[in-house]
Amino acid sequence: MDIIIRADAQEVGKEAAAIMAPFIKQGRTIGLATGSSPLTTYRELIRMYESGELTFKTIQAFLLDEYVGLARDDKNSYFRTIRDEFTAHVDFVDANVHSPDSTDPDPYHAAALYEQKIIDTGVAIQLLGVGVNGHIGFNEPTSALQGPTKVQALHPQTIKDNARFFNDCIENVPTHAMTQGLGTITRAENIIMVATGEAKADAIHRIVEGPLTALCPGSVLQLHADVTIVVDEAAASKLEHADYYRTMERIRL
């Protein structure tokens, strides 16, 4: 696990985009995440596209998750969010951006189909954010560390955190989502996690330096052979070995 500490969210985004760019240039499949932390990464990837450094015409992408019951064109769906924040600003083909079928009357069947599609295609590099309780995707605390794509009831903290996207009304937030499982996520060849802000500091500390536990789903990344975590100074503020991580980056061969 490589830990990279940058000054602020903009620098985090630049670093993450630089890590993802070689995979995109090679035409590899990428995994995309929603939330506030990846936004600066998407802005930098858009800049690289506009400058002619990248093209996404042949890239396949898989979304981490989707709310159960929200159509793709709903303003709060994650497919729509990713489109508005990223894919519509580059030359992505909409049909190449995959998400769970959130309107399937049998979400469990839809989750199984999505899992198989990811298995068949594979993901070269997965971009992740992290929740304040250590969740990745919608894998809430106590999620199976090797579980497949699933239907997940949302933790009250997650519902509270996401209410800001639903007119600050908790009652409007869906109670369930389909999410890639922790086993699905960690099948990606490479993983990059981004986190910014003091609110994420405890989760980053637990993921990097805490024990492997289902109570902190992100700690499963300790088992992956190729993980890079890019954080700003605020999100790194509770890391006990921050100076060591800075030194290791500086002397890396």
From Swiss-Prot:
Q: Which PANTHER family does the annotation name? A: GLUCOSAMINE-6-PHOSPHATE ISOMERASE
This chain's function reads: Catalyzes the reversible isomerization-deamination of glucosamine 6-phosphate (GlcN6P) to form fructose 6-phosphate (Fru6P) and ammonium ion.
- Its name, as the record gives it, is Glucosamine-6-phosphate deaminase
Q: In which pathway does it act?
A: Amino-sugar metabolism; N-acetylneuraminate degradation; D-fructose 6-phosphate from N-acetylneuraminate: step 5/5
Species name: Corynebacterium efficiens (strain DSM 44549 / YS-314 / AJ 12310 / JCM 11189 / NBRC 100395)
Q: Which GO terms describe its biological process?
A: carbohydrate metabolic process; glucosamine catabolic process; N-acetylglucosamine catabolic process; N-acetylneuraminate catabolic process
Q: Name one GO molecular function term.
A: identical protein binding
Gene that this polypeptide is encoded by: nagB
Which major enzyme category is it?
Answer: hydrolase
